[in-house]
Amino acid sequence: MEHFDIAIVGGGPAGLTAAIYARRAGRSVLLLEKEGFGGQIASSPRVENFPGLMSVSGAELADRLYNQAEALGARLELEEVLEVRDGPCKTVITDYGTYTCSALILATGMKHRTLGLPGEDTMAGISFCAVCDGSFYQGKDVAVCGGGNTALQDALFLADLCRHVTVIHRRSAFRGDPVLVQALQKRTNVSFAMDTVVTALLGGGVLTGLSLRNTVTGAETSLAVSGLFEAVGQLPETSLSAALTPVDAGGFIPCGEDCVTSAAGVFAAGDCRAKEVRQLTTACADGAVAALAACNYCKCI
């Protein structure tokens, strides 16, 4: 059973930054990621709010973080963590093996919130990633559901590929950046369904349309689309932390700006921890803070 000074669960910006800082401090580091390094930012078509980079694709930024952590000597593994156990040494059990560590950083991020409609999990034509799946709908009509920056960015990306994009939002105004809204309003192949919710997915095994309801008038309509891209928020991915530290009512891990949890030797970084602002830069900042706190913990045991 291999032992590391610090194990990090989650390979997004917070986890990769933590790996960089911990390795620079001379600690042995294991980072475990179950899906793809870089987290959700890796699927973003453009990142324009990262200091020092005017514009970069999410995939390129993810590659840069990964390559830096790897070059510094962090052990980076694509393994799903199934269980974590507390103790003088933490035990991390994955689908490939078991590891121990002196300090554990939880940087598990968030997962997509769904609409909760019948057929959503099995029907072809439902996606949470415009960059990943947009090319499948070239020249077709699609819908984007959501009102934040992710939904607006997805709609802009899809407008370059698809015949028509309908943006569906349950409120009367978008929550995303005004500059994105203005960019969408200039597109001739984009329309908006405001104060509107999706009530049903139409089609057998393949999506052919949506049933919609206006939340103000109650009017019900249908919209023919080949694809639905959901961007309706996220939920913290904190099921693993239950064995180590409690979560708050929203499912987030409570800890201060020092990223120290209530469990000795356990730290939280990025979107999974309770905080006011969740951005790429704050995730990286959390990773640095958590790594330094974990290094200090290792010095004291």
Regions found by a protein language model. Give the residues of each.
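FAD-site-proximal beta/loop scaffold in flavoenzymes
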Residues: 24, 121-136, 230-279, 286-289, ...
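Beta1-alpha1 glycine-rich phosphate/pyrophosphate-binding loop at the start
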Residues: 4-72, 152-177
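Glycine/small-residue-rich loop that forms an oxyanion/phosphate-binding "nest" at active or ligand-binding sites
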Residues: 76-136
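Residue-level detector of alpha-helix initiation sites
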Residues: 12-13, 36, 110-112, 148-150, ...
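A Rossmann-like FAD-binding core segment of flavoenzymes
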Residues: 69-93, 98-100, 160-256, 296-300
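Glycine-rich dinucleotide-binding loop and its adjacent helix/turn
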Residues: 110-149, 153-155, 159-161, 254-256
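Internal hydrophobic alpha-helix adjacent to the cofactor/substrate pocket in enzyme cavities
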Residues: 156, 163-164, 283-301
